[in-house]
């Protein structure tokens, strides 16, 4: 597979916001945060039931491998949400997160939760004994327009790969990891990340999985790009339901 390197939006001269990005312009500019991904691609485009896989897993480790022993303060916010994030009730109640945060396909949530528990027990065998049980934080978006979700392509090994490959370097974006089969504004969507450096030397980083919107609604820095491009894509097949969703993780080292 040949991956074409594409410019990020700031490299094209578009400047969003008043603060400068960090060195990587990624959530990993926040000290301690690591990100790992596993992309699952199988088969050519085909009808439901053909076993085509366009999916994956994205893992965010707030404090790297020590997230369980070094819990971080956390909160949550839901706007018109109809999706699922496991463990969110505990986060809201305790104000803490003690597991990696994983993102994946809607019908893979159960598998990813189970695999994450296996991973955590392997690394922290005192869970359920000396220490309390855990509820992994796993969020989802629906990639069923490009991915044959009924074939259950996500396996434990994919979750382990995402977790074990997590690093603090640049983060791959676009159709990778959990974003592999996502659509945004009728184009390929996927994973996106950015960061901003604040006065005092603090960093704020964001990672999203984007899976929503119609072409006509696409704007870039206020410019109605979608409306300008629409004539080029007349007659192009599009998914019927575009309400979709977006999942975002925000990290900061500010006090």
Residue spans of the language-model regions?
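A structural signal for small-residue-enriched, beta-sheet-centric alpha/beta enzyme cores
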Residues: 2-255
């Amino acid at each position: 597979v040949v991956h074409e390197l594409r410019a990020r939006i700031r490299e094209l001269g578009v400047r969003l916001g008043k603060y400068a990005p960090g060195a990587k312009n990624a959530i990993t500019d926040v000290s301690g945060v690591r990100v790992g991904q596993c992309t699952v691609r199988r088969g050519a485009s085909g009808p439901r039931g053909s076993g085509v896989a366009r999916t994956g897993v994205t893992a965010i480790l707030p404090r790297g491998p020590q997230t369980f022993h070094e819990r971080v303060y956390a909160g949550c916010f839901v706007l018109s949400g109809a999706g699922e994030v496991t463990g969110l009730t505990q986060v809201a109640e305790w104000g803490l997160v003690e597991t990696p945060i994983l993102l994946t396909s809607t019908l893979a949530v159960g598998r990813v939760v189970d695999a994450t528990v296996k991973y955590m027990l392997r690394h922290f065998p005192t869970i359920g004994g000396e220490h309390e049980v855990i509820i992994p934080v796993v969020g989802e978006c629906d990639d069923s327009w490009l991915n044959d979700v009924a074939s259950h392509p996500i396996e434990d090994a994919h979750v382990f790969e995402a977790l074990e490959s997590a690093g603090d370097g640049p983060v791959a974006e676009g159709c990778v990891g959990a974003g592999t089969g996502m659509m945004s504004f009728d184009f390929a969507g996927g994973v996106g990340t950015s960061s901003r450096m604040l006065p005092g030397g603090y960093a704020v980083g964001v990672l999203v999985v984007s899976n929503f919107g119609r072409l006509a609604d696409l704007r870039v820095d206020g410019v109605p790009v979608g409306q300008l491009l629409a004539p080029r894509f007349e007659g192009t097949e599009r998914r019927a339901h575009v309400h979709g969703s977006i999942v975002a993780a925000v990290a900061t080292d500010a006090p």
